[in-house]
């Protein structure tokens, strides 16, 4: 499965470069849509069929409390301290089971991975 990524503005540029060098299709909000709010980022991920990767916990509220329509998958990275290259390594590790992430909101803490199904509802 070829994943198309949308990495949020808070995703480190060195990890974007590593992922692209490994052949991944990565759209970086910091490079092309800087300043877009979370709702716009979510809509872009959904429109382009990209998996959203973020360090921003607000997406959980948008998807589960406010019922915005989800993209194919969301990966929330909740690691308090890391080197800028590490997120690319984490995503490679998570891709070992990509079908286990599809249709899910996944939280990666550095030591644990938790997923819950995304609720496919109409956009708010």
Describe the residue ranges of each PLM region.
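Charged phosphate-binding loop/patch that engages nucleotide di/tri-phosphates or the phosphate backbone
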Residues: 3, 98-124
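N-terminal first-folded block
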Residues: 2-50
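Hydrophobic/aromatic beta-strand patches that form the interior of the parallel beta-sheet core
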Residues: 27, 53, 75-77, 106
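Short, glycine/charged-enriched secondary-structure capping and boundary segments
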Residues: 19-22, 41-42, 66-69, 90, ...
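Mid-chain, well-packed structural core segment of small domains
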Residues: 60-94
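Short glycine-/acidic-enriched loop or helix-start segments at secondary-structure transitions
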Residues: 16-17, 38, 62-65, 86, ...
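Acidic, metal-binding active-site segment of PIN/NYN-like and related structure-specific nucleases
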Residues: 45-63
């Amino acid at each position: 499965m070829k994943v198309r990524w949308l990495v949020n503005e808070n995703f480190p540029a060195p990890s974007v470069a590593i992922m692209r060098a490994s052949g991944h299709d990565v759209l970086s909000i910091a490079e092309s849509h800087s300043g877009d709010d979370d709702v716009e980022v979510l809509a872009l991920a959904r429109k382009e069929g990209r998996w959203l990767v973020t360090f921003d916990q607000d997406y959980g509220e948008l998807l589960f409390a406010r019922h915005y329509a989800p993209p194919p998958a969301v990966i929330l990275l909740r690691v308090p301290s890391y080197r800028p290259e590490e997120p690319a390594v984490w995503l490679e590790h998570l891709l070992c089971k990509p079908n286990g992430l599809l249709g899910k909101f996944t939280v990666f803490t550095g030591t644990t991975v938790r997923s819950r199904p995304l609720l496919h509802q109409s956009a708010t």
